Amino acid sequence: GEKVGNNFLDPGWTKYDKCALYVTFDLSGQLKQGGNAIGVMLGNGFFNIPRERYFKLLASYGAPRLLMKIQIEYADGSTQDIVTGTDWKTTESPVTYSSIYGGEDYDATKEQTGWMQPGFDDRTWNKALDTGWKTRLLSQRSAPLTVRDRIPTVRLFKTRKGQWVYDLGQNFSGIIRLSLHSKDTHPVKLYPAELLNPDSTVNQSASGAPFWFGYTPKGKGIESWQPQFTYYGFRYVQVEGAVPAGQPNPDGLPEITEITGLHTCYSAEDVGSFHCSKPLFNQTYELIDWAIRSNMASVLTDCPHREKLGWLEEAHLMQYSVQYRYNLARLYEKTFNDMRSTQAANGMIPTIAPELVEFEGGFKDTPEWGSTFVISPWYIYQWYGDTRPIETYYPDMQRYIDYLSSKADNHIIAYGLGDWFDIGPESPGESQLTSNGVTATAIYYYDVTLMEKMANLLGKPDDARKYQELAARIKQAFNRTFWN
C-alpha cells in the first residue's frame, strides 16, 4: 500500500454539528490495471475526545466515521463512483488509543499484513455500519498540516532516577519518529515535555498531563513508528520501557536506535523573511517564528499542547506581522467560516472558534476576542485586495455589531477579559491595570469605523452613514468617560 498525500491530522477540525470538511486527492498515480484496493485508518481527533489521560475538554460526536467517494473517469469519457457504505469492511486497527489531548498508542502485533492491498482476506472483518449522521460538508480549501522539519536528538542523558531523556534542542509542535530494535513485545512509553524538573525528569505540569506516545513492538528486529492522530508541544522525550542502543541493558528491553522530532504545522507558503546584522534581533525573530509555526494548525491556537483551541484575539493581534512571513489567506478563510459556525442567535461571537466547548463569563464572550470577525476580513482586504470575505460575512458582522451595541451602556462596553494577563500586583489573569471599559469600548469603536469603510466598499452608503454616526457617539462617550 502507498499513502496518498503527506497530510497530517486531516481534515481540519470544525464545529462538527454545523459543518465538516472533506479533502480531495488525485489518485491517478496510484490506480493500476486489474485489482485495486483502498484502506483508511481513522483516529478520534476533536470529533471524539476520550476521558483517559489528559483532556482540556470532553466532547464527542460519536465514534470516528468515514465518508468517501472515489470518482474514476475512463479514457472513453465514462465515469464510475465508488462510495463508502455498508458493503465496506472494518476492523480494529493497531492504533489502540488516540486522543488529541492525551497521546496515542500503537500495538504493532496487531498489524495485518497486506490489509490495504488487493486480494487481502477480510472474511474476519465486520461490515461497516451506516451511522446516519449528517452535517453540512465543505471542501477544505486551506492547506494541510504537514511535517515541516525533522529535528535530531542533540543530547542524551540519564536522570538520577535512572530514566533516559532525549533532548531535541528545540521546542516545537509535532510528534516523534521512533526507531528501535526489539526481540520481544515489551511496550515502550515516550513522554514529551517542554520543561525539565530539578531532577532532570520531564515536566508536563504546564502543558497537560499525562500525555504519552505508546508503542508495542512486534519483537522481530528493527522497527520504526510515528503517531498519526495527535501532537504535542515539546523539546524533551523521556523513555520508559526501553534503553538507548549501546547502553547497558540487563533486562533485555527494546533498544532505541533513534528518536527524531517531526515538526508539524500548517503548510503555509513562505512569503517573507528577516535577517539583520544584530544577532539578538535574529534570535528574537527565530524564537517568534517557531512560536508562530507551532501554533498554526487548522486553527490558530494559543498553545500546541494544553488547549489547542482557536482563541480569536491572536487571529487579529498577530495577523499583520504574520502575513509578512506567511500567506494565510486560505487559513483565515477557514477561520471566518469557523466564526460564522459558532455565532449565536443574538449575534455574539464566542472567544474560540470553532466553539468545541462552551466556557462561561469572559471566557465565552469578550469583545476584544469576538471582534476578529470584523477586523480580520478588513486586514485580508488590505493585504491581498480580496473583497470576498467582506462580501460573504458582512451580514454576520452587522449582527455582531448589533450585539455589541446591545451590551453597551451609553456607548460604553465594560465586560470580558480585557487586557488579559497583564503584569500587575496580583497573579496574572483578567486585566488589573486597565479597566475593561477602556479596551472593550476602544475595540468597539474600531469595529464600527471598519464597518463604515466596508459599507462604503460594498456600495452601501446608508450603512456607512449609520456606522459613521455611531462611531462619533462612541468616541464622544469614551473621551467623556476615560479622558482626564
Task: Give the label of every model feature segment.
Residues 168, 309, 367-368, 442:
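Short helix-capping and inter-helix turn/linker motifs at the boundaries of alpha-helical repeat units
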